[in-house]
């Protein structure tokens, strides 16, 4: 007898000890042992009294009918005992129940029509199972579609789920604001009964009371909620919850009082005003205006994955959910015909670029706090809530900062902001997509050139890493698009008084330099209309310059330029050949028979001007030598050959950007040589490491001392790690070399022009003898770099597909390493 008393006391003490351990921080091994002991203790107490569980689960009666049923079933259950006799335990032991919430949560329980027994279990209500469920569009989901949940399929609709059961984890209910078994709508339109708990501003949904990890974990801060009352054909009250960064959640509740109670708790947790709770007067946050512009559509295509926590769920585009939903049983022909139309009108998540603020967990004094974070003007601002009424801490300047992912087993999506190695802040996102979005935002604002693929993501699987990288690249691209440089074709012309640079850093020839003093002495017209008409736009249809206008022709008739041109034409031989065609452009300044005449022209010709060609893509000018406005004059045969050569070389250099091309070729060549030299060094180091590895393996085979053997194995592991690192660096180097080679080929082929090139073919193929033309009968000169010339220009950028194999290999290596 004493043995049984000692065993009973041992079990009691063990139960108390396990409860004490629940309050302690234990290691993973200790947690496993504790859970094993708790399970053994539960099994022992359950097997020692088989009728205890039944009596306990049916002791709470609502009316006399249920009480009579329980009394009728009790003898039948006792008759099934192995020994044919009732058990020794006649009454159920007192089990610890979860703490009740504050009294303010249940003021309206007194208004219930059906009187209920006042008991602690009465607080946890449950939704009655439904026979059929109707979607928002009135289509009944086929009842033949079986649920994926075995418990729902076997027990869900046969008997109500009593709470709490003896195996229920009371730990789940600790510090909970409200909890109950509710119906939750799945993405196929079916309903699943789950244990819903609101704790620490989060909604937790458990598949059953035995589970320790929630199937759904959503932060309710900033979320909106709508109460949809029970309709005629429906059997449930609905609460539609729209979180900030998760899918829409629909909960089914049994009574209006329960729905209003949950609505009030969710509104208190979310921090939103309660005025917009009723349907039709919904309070929608700013972020939802971008993401959910059609709330009714969003409810139709709910997505709550049953294969993992939806904290890391990736929201699907409405059209994909539409296809999944319409493919269920009982769909109509009209729905199939409308699938294509819905795809065309569905909203793409393009507004993602506008989301520069959301809730993040911030590490403050070794504690994680939820803060509303916003990126604005290269600063990261922290607020207590989304209303931005109270600043949580001082803004953080992002200029020059580094953003480094810092995942841990407990915080997979955490990252740090560093400045010169010093940690300024540590943040945590709620999903892989949100983490990637914020990485891209912070990298863009800090001005960092780091590729998101270069980061190391420990404790994160390959799928989530790819999601983080793709989201980061997407936000980077959208931020670059948002803050891109102004486009001249859209933003209009630049200001007139701005100093514009030359197209290229090309040294002009001595001939052009000799004309510059005359340009300085030239009186520039102040009329803005003349300035506007002086530009020849390369991407438009060629128009006449103001030099060909009647007013300008009259103004130039009395200028010394025409007298110089007349002198030049009179000095030419009488049997001059046919002049150039009107398609040929005006060439350089009129040259006489000798250099002395050219020098004498300089002080006498103050009206010579350098025409400019406006390139809209980069808002730059190309300087050309003075050209004749109304007459086409070629270089006379008696002119010195060096003048012609300098003329052609200068034009070619201006056209091709010779100095820039040579500089790019030189730079890429040096970069290629440097990378190849580094590659050879890595190869030599790898060969040496492999040699040492072979020698170590041979030594390991011959070694018999255990201590020496352990040290050799450790050294071998270190060499293996070093080999992997060197191999990874070699792969990166190969990719860099491939990129440099491609750039070098492009540079050698010619400069990557800015959408235009200066065509000087006409300058080199000028007829040796000009035709003297009077100003009255001057033909129209086609502007240089006209649109027709540009169409015939060959492509200077060749798209290549090389290097993809190495790129794929690198991606697979990174996925394998993670």
From Swiss-Prot:
PROSITE patterns of this UniProt entry?
Answer: PH_DOMAIN (PS50003)
Give start-end positions of Polar residues composition bias. Answer: 85-94
Coiled-coil annotation reads 652-749
What InterPro entries is this protein classified in? AFAP (IPR030113), PH-like_dom_sf (IPR011993), PH_domain (IPR001849)
Q: Which GO terms describe its cellular component?
A: cytoplasm; cytosol; plasma membrane
The PH domain, residue ranges? 175-271, 353-447
State the compartments where it is located. Answer: Cytoplasm
Ranges of biased composition (kind: Acidic residues): 123-139
Which UniProt keywords are present, listed alphabetically? Coiled coil, Cytoplasm, Phosphoprotein, Repeat
Phosphotyrosine PTM positions: 56, 413
Which sequence positions carry the modification called Phosphoserine? 408, 484
| Gene Ontology molecular function, alphabetical | protein tyrosine kinase activator activity; SH2 domain binding; SH3 domain binding
Q: Name one GO biological process term.
A: regulation of mitotic cell cycle
The tissues in which it is expressed are:
Detected in spleen and thyroid, and at lower levels in kidney, brain, lung and pancreas.
- Region: Disordered, residue numbers: 66-163, 513-532, 765-787
The protein's predominant localisation is cytoplasm
Q: Per the record's keyword annotation, is Phosphoprotein included, yes or no?
A: yes
**Where does the source fall among the domains of life?**
Eukaryota
- Record carries keyword Protein biosynthesis: no
Q: How is it modified after translation?
A: Tyrosine phosphorylated (by SRC).
- Result after altering residue 4 to F: Reduced interaction with SRC
Its biological purpose: May play a role in a signaling cascade by enhancing the kinase activity of SRC. Contributes to SRC-regulated transcription activation.
Oligomeric state and interaction partners are given as:
Interacts with SRC. Interacts with LCK when tyrosine phosphorylated.
Q: What protein is this chain from?
A: Actin filament-associated protein 1-like 2
Source organism per entry reads Homo sapiens (Human)
